[in-house]
Amino acid sequence: MGQVVVITGLADGMGREAAKLLAAAGDTIAGFDMDAAGIASLQTELDGLSPSSGKTHYLVPLNILDRPGILRFRDEVLAKYKRVDTVLSNVGIGFFGPFEEIDLEAARRCLEINVIGAAAIFQAFLPAMRRQGSGKLIAMSSLVGQVPFPFESIYSASKFAIEGMVMSLRYEVAPFGIRVALIEPAQVSTTFAAKIHTLPPEGSPYRERARRFIARDDELIKTAPTPLQAARRIAEIIHQDRPDFHNQVDFMSTFFLFLNRFLPVRLRDMILLNHMDIQ
C-alpha cells in the first residue's frame, strides 16, 4: 500500500520532482506552497500520473508562516486520508552576505521560515503519528548544517538549528514508533543560489572575496545534481522503513562531511576555502 506523504515547498525544484516520483510509485501526495500557479500545475501532473488508481492528491496554496492555515491543512489531510505516513519539510529560503552587513530583520525572516516553519509542520502532524504508532518526519537540511561556509552565516545558523532540533526530536518520538531523518544536500542545479547571490556594495571590504565565492559557486552548480537526480534520492529515503538519520544527496556533501568528521578544523578550513577560491 502506498504512503500518504505530506510535502511542504513542492511547487518547483526538488520538492516538485520528488512529489512526481512518489506519485508515480503509488504514493498519495498532500502538500502546500506559496506559489499558487506552481501548485495548480503540479496538481494536474500528479493526477495524470495515477489516474487508474483513483487516488486524489491534495495540494493547496499556503504560507509556511500561516500557523492557523497549517492546522486547517492538517485537519483536511487527516479527514481525507485518515492517516499520514511521512512528512517532508522542504520549505526554505537562502540568505547570503557578509555578516557585518546583513539586515537583521531579513535574517529573522530566514530563521523563522527555515526553522520555525519546519517545527510548525512537524508539530501539526506529530499527534496523528503518535496515535497511529508510526510515521517518518524528514527535514531538508544542508551541508552547511554541519560545515558552515563564509557569507552564509544566517543560512548556516538556520540549518544548524534544524539539525539540533531534529536530533532532539528523534529521542522524544522514538518510543512511539516515529522515525526522524535529515537530508543534507550541498548543491543542486536550481535557481536557489542565483536568487540570493548579491554582491556587497562598492567599497565593502568583503566585496572581492564575495565575488570570487559567487563565481566559484556558480561554476560548481553547473555540474551539481539536477532536481530530478536529487529527488530520486529523496524518494528512496522516504520509501525506507528505517532511514539513516543523516542522508546525503551529492558527492560534495559526502566529501565535506567526511572531512568535517576526520580532519582537524584548521586543515578542513584550508581545503574548504581553497575549494571556494577565497583562500
Q: Where are the predicted features?
A:
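SDR active-site lid
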Residues: P175-D244
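Active-site helix of classical SDR
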Residues: F122, S158
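Conserved glycine-rich Rossmann-like NAD(P)H-binding loop of the short-chain dehydrogenase/reductase
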Residues: D27-S41
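The beta1-alpha1 cofactor-binding region of Rossmann-like NAD(H)/NADP(H)-dependent oxidoreductases
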Residues: P61-R72, L104
